[in-house]
């Protein structure tokens, strides 16, 4: 069986959707099936490869809008050549990650035209933060239109949490169920066995630690968390991640680990 995962964001970009897709794909391979991940092009990475986990990856040309946070499909000869290679492989099932990327809209509609069964997994609990002005209004309108186009394919929607499922009601969608993020107990145990003493390594003494792990982008709230922690005596914020807010947080956080 060949399962194709469409994820506009994917490793080595750090984030929840990226690891979620990777875990699904590698478990697909481990179960004896074939996994294909279709994602966005990144500098210095091949447009097509099979990685060490046996996952076949296609990286489509995009415009890296919003510093890469919102990659937009870039039509052209390379795009059409790569997508032709994907569709010729007789996919048995498609999984579309998130509802609002241009790749998500394209993938859902293309799979529908080819009669390939699919589902959509949404990870969000709100609109992409773009402010309350004209830009924000345009962004919200785009999300509504994009979601309507994906919904029109008839694909079932799932949320990664109850909150994500509730958010789908904003677009007139009742989630078919929840597909939560999962932890691999064996991998976690192995990593924990060799974990360094971060309190000693970062020279934090006996201060209380607030830990943030995730992409350093406004919608994840790391900046707001840093402001709140700064008002608490004897408390330090340790952030692990990377993204556009990295320098902003580095100026505030006592210790910053990427």
Question: Which residues fall in each region the model found?
Answer:
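A conserved mid-protein helix/loop that constitutes part of the nucleotide-sugar donor-binding site
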Residues: 19, 208-231, 244-247
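Short hydrophobic "strand-cap" motifs at the C-terminus of beta-strands
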Residues: 6-8, 160, 182, 212-214, ...
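Nucleotide-sugar donor phosphate/pyrophosphate-binding loop at the beta->alpha transition
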Residues: 117-119, 126-149, 153, 158-159, ...
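An amphipathic, basic-hydrophobic alpha-helix
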Residues: 52, 61-94, 98, 102-109, ...
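N-terminal subdomain of nucleotide-sugar transferases
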Residues: 1-45, 49-59, 116, 230
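A short helix/loop element that forms part of the nucleotide-sugar donor recognition site in Leloir-type
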Residues: 189-204, 209
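Carbohydrate-associated surface elements
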Residues: 41, 163, 182
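Nucleotide-activated donor-binding/catalytic signature segment of Leloir-type glycosyltransferases, i.e.
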Residues: 247-258
């Amino acid at each position: 069986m060949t399962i194709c995962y469409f994820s506009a964001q994917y490793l080595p970009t750090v984030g929840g959707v990226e690891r979620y897709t990777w875990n699904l794909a590698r478990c697909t391979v481990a179960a004896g099936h074939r996994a294909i991940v279709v994602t966005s092009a990144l500098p210095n990475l091949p447009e097509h490869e099979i990685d060490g986990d046996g996952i076949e990856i296609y990286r489509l040309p995009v415009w890296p809008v919003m510093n890469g946070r919102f990659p937009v499909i870039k039509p052209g000869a390379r795009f059409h050549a790569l997508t032709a290679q994907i569709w010729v492989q007789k996919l048995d099932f498609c999984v579309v990650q998130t509802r609002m990327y241009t790749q998500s809209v394209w993938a859902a509609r293309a799979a529908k035209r080819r009669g390939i069964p699919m589902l959509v997994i949404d990870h969000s609990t709100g609109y992409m933060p773009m402010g309350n002005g004209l830009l924000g209004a345009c962004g919200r309108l785009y999300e509504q239109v994009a979601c309507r186009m994906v919904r029109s394919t008839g694909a079932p929607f799932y949320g990664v949490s109850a909150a994500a499922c509730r958010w789908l009601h904003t677009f007139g969608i009742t989630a078919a169920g929840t597909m939560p993020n999962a932890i691999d107990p064996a991998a976690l145990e192995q990593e924990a066995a060799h974990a360094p003493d971060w309190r000693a390594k970062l020279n934090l003494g006996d201060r209380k630690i607030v830990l943030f792990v995730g992409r350093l982008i406004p919608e994840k709230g790391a900046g707001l968390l840093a402001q709140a922690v700064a008002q608490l005596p004897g408390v330090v914020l340790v952030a692990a991640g990377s993204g556009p807010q990295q320098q902003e947080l580095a100026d505030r956080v006592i210790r910053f680990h990427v």
